[in-house]
Swiss-Prot record:
The active site is at residue 127. Keywords: Aromatic hydrocarbons catabolism, NAD, Oxidoreductase. HAMAP family: Ac_ald_DH_ac. GO terms for biological process: catabolic process. It comes from Mycolicibacterium vanbaalenii (strain DSM 7251 / JCM 13017 / BCRC 16820 / KCTC 9966 / NRRL B-24157 / PYR-1) (Mycobacterium vanbaalenii). Belongs to the acetaldehyde dehydrogenase family. InterPro entries: Acetaldehyde_dehydrogenase, Acetylaldehyde_DH_C, NAD(P)-bd_dom_sf, Semialdehyde_DH_NAD-bd. This is Acetaldehyde dehydrogenase 3. GO terms for molecular function: acetaldehyde dehydrogenase (acetylating) activity; NAD binding. NAD(+) binds at residues 12-15, 158-166, 277.
Amino acid sequence: MADKKSVAIVGSGNISTDLLYKLLRSEWLEPRWMIGIDPESEGLARARKLGLETSHEGVDWLLAQSELPDMVFEATSAYVHKAAAPRYAEAGIRAIDLTPAAVGPGVIPPANLRAHLDAPNVNMVTCGGQATIPMVYAVSRVVEVPYAEIVASVSSASAGPGTRANIDEFTKTTSAGVQNIGGAQRGKAIIILNPAEPPMIMRDTIFCAIPEHADHAAITQSIKDVVAEVQTYVPGYRLLNEPQFDEPSVVNGGNHVVTVFVEVEGAGDYLPPYAGNLDIMTAAATKVGEEIAKESLAATAGGAQA
């Protein structure tokens, strides 16, 4: 369709397959290719049944085609995307990176969605980042946040080989995002793979140090406003209870602190609802891809009219 941007999904695992279902519903993006390296991949088989062109010969195959996609969504691993990113750029393909490679600027929709719509490569940070950085941002836009710490607890069953291979990059990339996008002066990220059966829904705890005389009501309202914004693309994102304000103590390092508890229930497109950590990643990536497509199509239409 002329009014949709063509898309290739690189990677054929859990995240890529869930992403495919979201992209198929998009009014702005048309998934046409799925690329993997395993010929027996369930993701490739599903994509074929849904009418996509598939290959297990990787990025080499995709870039050798006579028709190239307008946009690539990559959900492989950090080191794979680092190698492929310059090749996408050379071919003029916009890249949305769902690995922790962080080749391009990180994007968390409530915080900085519109800042990087013209970037050739954008990074979706991490699942923990997508769930928690909006809360740090909600606090830091009201008061100074000298330190923020996030703890993401996800079901072990939702963490495939790619997630496990990227654990070190996860903590580095998320910590950097807490600072650079969330607005904290210092940030720390911790991920817990919870082995409980039946699998637990994704839960996140966000600690933000705040000034002594901070306006608690303004912080609480800002948090609720950002939660509502995230819910426009992840309906299962919710506060578990009211933000909690604590006086300085030995436990919190002598800081005045606000603590936010959220949980993320997935939409159940391909992954089970407990895998909210993966669902928020694919939903946020779809949101960013759609905004890039809208901007690009609007610019094209404007140029044609001129």
